[in-house]
Amino acid sequence: MTDVNPVAVVGIAAIMPMAPDADAFWANITGGRYCVTDVPPERWNPALYYSPDHSARDKTYSTIGSWVREFEWDPIRWKLPIPPTVSAQMDQGQRWALSAARRALMYAGWPKWTVDSDKVAVI
């Protein structure tokens, strides 16, 4: 490979369990915070999916995990072109991705930046 394209990371964001933003996530890491809990009842019912038998089909043998519980989602206030009916039907993962992308762009100076938007990407 001879072509090298430099990349500048100028904005960061994260939505993680017990960390609605990158700063809280870093604080959890540096503070050694344990972010694993029992499954919240709004996620799934352990009575339906749990089995202590590790070989049970269509079951899990664990009732713990890390769960995103808080993050900001306000597409109307953010003036995103997402109709409320579409927003209401979006998967939570899509909302997390859009919210984190928006926050990373803002961290980088958007919407007041003076860079060529064709050279901007969110990964």
What are these regions (language model features)?
Residues 1-87, 94, 98, 102-110:
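ACP-dependent fatty acid/polyketide chain-elongation machinery
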Residues 115-117:
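Terminal amphipathic helices with adjacent charged low-complexity linkers/tails
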Residues 120-123:
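Extended hydrophobic secondary-structure segments that form protein cores and membrane-embedded regions
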